[in-house]
Amino acid sequence: MCGILAVLGCSDDSQAKRVRILELSRRLKHRGPDWSGLHQHGDNYLAHQRLAIVDPASGDQPLFNEDKSIIVTVNGEIYNHEELRKQLPNHKFFTQCDCDVIAHLYEEHGENFVDMLDGIFSFVLLDTRDNSFIVARDAIGVTSLYIGWGLDGSVWIASELKGLNDECEHFEVFPPGHLYSSKEREFRRWYNPPWFNEAIIPSTPYDPLVLRNAFEKAVIKRLMTDVPFGVLLSGGLDSSLVASVTARYLAGTKAAKQWGAKLPSFCVGLKGAPDLKAGKEVADFLGTVHHEFEFTIQDGIDAIEDVIYHTETYDVTTIRAATPMFLMSRKIKSSGVKWVISGEGSDEIFGGYLYFHKAPNREEFHQETCRKIKALHRYDCLRANKSTYAWGLEARVPFLDKDFIKVAMDIDPEFKMIKHDEGRIEKWILRKAFDDEENPYLPKHILYRQKEQFSDGVGYGWIDGIKDHAAKHVTDRMMFNASHIFPFNTPNTKEAYYYRMIFERFFPQNSARLTVPGGPSVACSTEKAIEWDASWSNNLDPSGRAALGVHVSAYEHQINPVTKGVEPEKIIPKIGVSPLGVAIQT
């Protein structure tokens, strides 16, 4: 994948404008260090920074149809491109690049071809015959994309905010699963799955083999590559299943013939972190070539400004988790690996976050999963995309495969609910689907390991260390006046205030701050789910430890010595235990 920048309908076609667009495109160079390109057609500019994964030799962009009347710049991976080529027998392709099909599909089907694409993508397509254009983003928003409007009437498209924020009067997140047409001058949704209507509660019975097969297909199709790759392996359920399925099926792929059947795996954490221990155990079980990266709290703190610049957010949960991922991505890229397969999306689909223990019924459980999936592009998708692309590393996420989501979201949510009296913990149906006694995918205790949020699993001292650091830079007086300084998404903790100050230095525009989600949350819940328990209403910390009793000791005993002199109640949340045994921050 890559970084894209397009300026459409610009009133200035001078050389100076071209130079400026090249300058802005270079702000995205980290996303595509292998090659860059800029195509100008009249008052339209399409720029591209390429990370070459498929057909590195001839897949440079922009891409064209036969007579070059259709021009495409795209950030994406089209997993069914070979099947689509077979449906276009009368077309000539200039490259083997998977995204080469887009221009030709448009020629055949007009604007209504986007749902034919199986993959992740953000693209701009310019039809020079009538000077019209379309822009589209993948179903869930795995790829990042923004749209802006200039005072001269131009439309700007960029993979990251930093490509357009200094030039546009207004800009916003390009909505996932949508297409923007210059002819209609509006967005329209091309992705319309049944679960988008939250009022419709699915009733399909749970079939473990159907779920297992759907996930295996999602992983296998993502092994399309002409360059070395690896897997992120924290030792949690999601990354372990991804690694297990990848290792199991890698030998029969073209990738194995090129790069060998030994799968590289990667894990990051503080010294002694839960993830390092569990990741090593899973790697030994699967026989991967495992790499561990230890970081210190100071390493993470030193990286926070870079993390905020690259992730373009001030959301607390995202920054906490993105920092170790950012550090690990640099190490991975230096090893020669160009992309990794990762486990994002499972918790949203299956209700894996620990607050789902309190879901009152199947209807509200399902509706919350719908809300969580719809918001992924602002949270985990953003983190996984931008913290890896900061170093020119691509992340692929099989749990967010369109076909797999359909299978998983069609299941009656009654089967997903946590039921202690029946021995069902969070994500029980996913665990059960891969519980194979004869040919085990994972060790039993790993398969049934309880949920750890990434920012917790890398080491409980990490979050406490950030809070300590923020407390030294944000005073009580600053917090007292926070609502006047930041009236939108007012930070309610010193950590949040610290992140916000950094974000505003990089992205001071009002449009920029509006791209970041806000509102109260407990252990990553949506605001609506807080209604499930009255004691959650005063929650200030989105960490998973705010909803899990076994983590109380981490809050009590892992405080960094630098907090000396800071009142503990300002740093450490108070924990109460609910009747379900779930610790809730109060």
UniProtKB/Swiss-Prot annotation:
GO annotation (BP), single: L-asparagine biosynthetic process
GO annotation, cellular component aspect: cytosol
NCBIfam families reported in the protein's UniProt record: PRK09431.1
EC number: 6.3.5.4
Name assigned to this protein: Asparagine synthetase, nodule [glutamine-hydrolyzing]
Cysteine disulfide links: none
InterPro entries xref list: Asn_synth_AEB, Asn_synthase, Asn_Synthetase, AsnB_N, GATase_2_dom, Ntn_hydrolases_N, Rossmann-like_a/b/a_fold
Source organism per UniProt: Pisum sativum
Reaction equations catalysed: L-aspartate + L-glutamine + ATP + H2O = L-asparagine + L-glutamate + AMP + diphosphate + H(+)
Domain annotation Glutamine amidotransferase type-2: ranges: 2-185
Pathway of action: Amino-acid biosynthesis; L-asparagine biosynthesis; L-asparagine from L-aspartate (L-Gln route): step 1/1
Active site (record annotation): 2 (for gatase activity)
Keyword ATP-binding: yes
